Regions:
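Active-site microenvironments of metalloenzymes and redox enzymes
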Residues: 1-123, 180-185
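Short, intrinsically disordered, charge-balanced linker/junction segments flanking boundaries
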Residues: 25, 189-193
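Structural recognition of the beta-strand scaffold that forms the well-ordered cores
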Residues: 26-29, 79-81, 87-88, 127, ...
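Short, flexible loop/turn elements at secondary-structure junctions
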Residues: 31-34, 84-85, 130-133, 159-162, ...
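Short, well-ordered junction/capping motifs at the entry into regular secondary structure
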Residues: 67-73, 120-169, 188
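Short loop/turn segments at secondary-structure transitions that flank enzyme active sites
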Residues: 95, 132-135, 169-172, 179-181
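Short, low-complexity, polar/charged sequence segments that are solvent-exposed and flexible
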Residues: 98-100, 174-175, 193
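Short, electropositive, low-hydrophobicity segments enriched in small/polar residues
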Residues: 110, 116, 131, 168, ...
Length: 193
């Protein structure tokens, strides 16, 4: 019950959506530093060499606020994907497939409109967003805060993309090792932001 999406602004619990299991909902409210720290902790737990060298410089409210982080070359442990790796996975892994150019990970825009923070039935099958957050189907208006079912949802309740990955569109944002940058028109090997 400490997952932030499980609580309203006054710390009372939301009712979970359609029997969602709290333990199967995504973690949220973690810093980028928390995410790389977790990668190292999981690596150590599984006997793998941690992928990051981390020197924590500031912690606030149990979260790492600042740290010096570097990638350990050739480490066998878990790490965050690069932005390019995340995009490759979200697009379905095959640049020659139609899904590579879909508007959403796993679905194209079904109602012929581009998504611009508006209702779009093309997104309903693959992602949770402000218009389908409670029922899973697009409603006539955005979902407001402090409503039963508002917040994150159990992972895997929507359709997976071509690689079998869920929630690459909607639910929560994912951390990447680097940042987004505009793609060059040419080929780039192992791009980073």
């Amino acid at each position: 019950e400490s997952n932030p999406s499980y609580c309203t602004a006054d710390s009372t619990s939301y009712t979970l959506f359609n029997g969602d299991v709290q333990e199967k909902r995504p973690v949220e409210g973690v810093t980028w530093y928390d995410a790389v720290w977790y990668c190292n902790a999981l690596s150590k737990k599984e006997g793998l060499e941690p992928a990051y060298s981390i020197e924590v410089t500031s912690v606030y409210s149990k979260h790492i606020e600042a740290a010096t982080v570097s990638l350990v070359p050739n480490a066998t442990g878990y790490r965050l994907p690069t932005e390019a790796e995340w995009e490759y996975a979200a697009r379905g892994g095959d640049p020659n497939a139609a899904a590579w150019n879909y508007t959403f990970s796993g679905a194209d825009k079904a109602d012929g409109t581009s998504y611009s923070n508006n209702k779009n039935s093309g997104l309903d099958s693959v992602g949770w967003y402000c218009y389908n957050n409670i029922t899973g189907e697009s409603g006539d208006s955005k979902v407001t805060i402090d409503v039963s079912g508002k917040g994150t949802h159990e992972v895997g309740k929507k359709t997976a993309n071509a690689l079998g990955l869920y929630d690459m569109t909607g639910n929560v944002w994912e951390w990447c090792y680097d940042w987004y940058k505009t793609v060059n028109t040419g080929t780039e090997t192992a791009p980073t932001g």
